[in-house]
Amino acid sequence: MVLLSAGNLSISQSVREILQIEELREIGENGQPGPPITIWNAKSMFDAARVLGSAVRHVYDRDAEALKHAGLDFNVSFIFGGQVRGEGMRLFLVYSAGNFIEATTETPYFQVGESKYGKPVLDRVLTPETPLDEAAKCALVSMDSTMKSNLSVGLPLDLVVYEANKLQTDRVIC
């Protein structure tokens, strides 16, 4: 699983820490609570995204009022992707409210943070059939375009290249 963030760094870091211990509890058919679902035991990426959304809401409940009094918005978004054994690759965009959407063949990628300058590069080149190495190059060109067009965007950049069904990655570019 890979987690990328944009927005308020302190919120992102808090969510990341809460995510380590966050649990979802569902009521089973017998009316009793089932076993907790965590980021570590989720049986699907959808369930893992639900746990992430719950962690975002947990931090919101804890910090939003104090941020508001300081004149700050609760501003965070995440790209969350990966693969759970037995399931295909999945990619989610998680919003500040903890709700999320999933990538589709019509929307095969997500961006967080400043996107208007680099997005046209991606829209013109990427398709679901784009080879992985070409897609990685395209992502780097998109990020470079954004950095050159907007002075508030800068290093560091992180890029993870993951091949479906490997259940590991050996290419992390920073």
Segments (PLM) and residue ranges:
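N-terminal nucleophile
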Residues: 1-174
